[in-house]
Amino acid sequence: VAEFSLQEELSELFTLSLMLVSKRADIDLESLLLQSVKFRVVFNDVEQRQVSGIITQATRGDTHARRTIYYLTVQPALWRMNLNQDSRIYHRQSVPEILTSLLKKHCILFDCQLDEFHYTREYVTQKRESDYAFFARLVAEEGLNFWFEDDKLFFSDSHLGMTANLPLVYNPQIETATEMNVMNQARLGVSMTPARVIYKDYNPQSPDYRLTHRANIDPRVEGQKTLFELFESYGRFQKDAEAKPFVQRRHQAVENQRQAGSGQSNCFKLMPGKIFTLSEHPVDAMNTRWQIVTIHHHGKCPQALQEESGESGTYLHNEFSFMSGYNDWRALYRYKPLADGDEVATVVGPEGEEIYVNEEGCIRIHFHWDRYDKADENATCWVRFAQGWNGSGYGFMA
């Protein structure tokens, strides 16, 4: 390996770019695709960290002095979910249950730690989305985070699922560092955000009830009017108990933008899912716990190029963003895909029924794009409808 770059972010796929040197100029690039890769960084004979993934792109570069340069892009096995697009309906499952079924479908090694209660949803629709886009949307919507540890994906609904107690020493003179645990730059800033989050929905069973919930991001606006509000008119809930987690997660996602830090270090152990403790910073408030949100590692080993390496030696450094290690980071909200227009479906029900309705007059339908559900009384969910020939006597109303 002559050079590498590793880009990582909470709740995103990592991308490892490798520049390799080989004596062979005839390596079959097609045979490399989707092959497993393990990349290790060793310092003073001690392994700092291992990154596991699959090859998603391979390029042959220049050949000179009996050596050929190859460029590989490595991403986690979860990336394979981008290759499959589907439309389907999941019935009466919680989001963690849906995510688990997706990961098992693609043979992804995973683990999770869930500290909160996650409601069972009547139905969840995947519509013309890749499996990964659907996965990422549900993760953000449900307030989950995911990251990668060795060859395994890990997801959690709390920062308590992260690995803590990674020590970093602040030293702005990085050239004097003798260990790979030095942070040589630390910046902390604040940004303006909306002051309040408001979610509203409508329950036809209680049409007069104002199904509205709010959360104040800025405590100074408690009980006051503000121009800066984030209002969602479609909250995706039917009960107060279901609304509170949605509002709280959106509140946390916006609040995460209020204060954020950035830094540089030589520590390859830093990664999303890690909480580090900073020490020896001249500002006392900085000597506390912080969690990694994004990080970009870059390393170079010129010796791999032999006579072309010049006088420079091996080096590794990174740039990263971080937030408080005591708060929960939430991914930015992802909106679900919208239908292009009217959807064609067939009204369904049990065999022998003229029309199958519930106590509220709702019907069940089977969408023509649904490849997984049978066209019977278990298809989709109960759907409200309006037509000219409705009412208790099926009479026409004009």
Please tell me what each predicted stretch does.
Residues 1-398:
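Amphipathic alpha-helical and helix-coil boundary elements used as assembly
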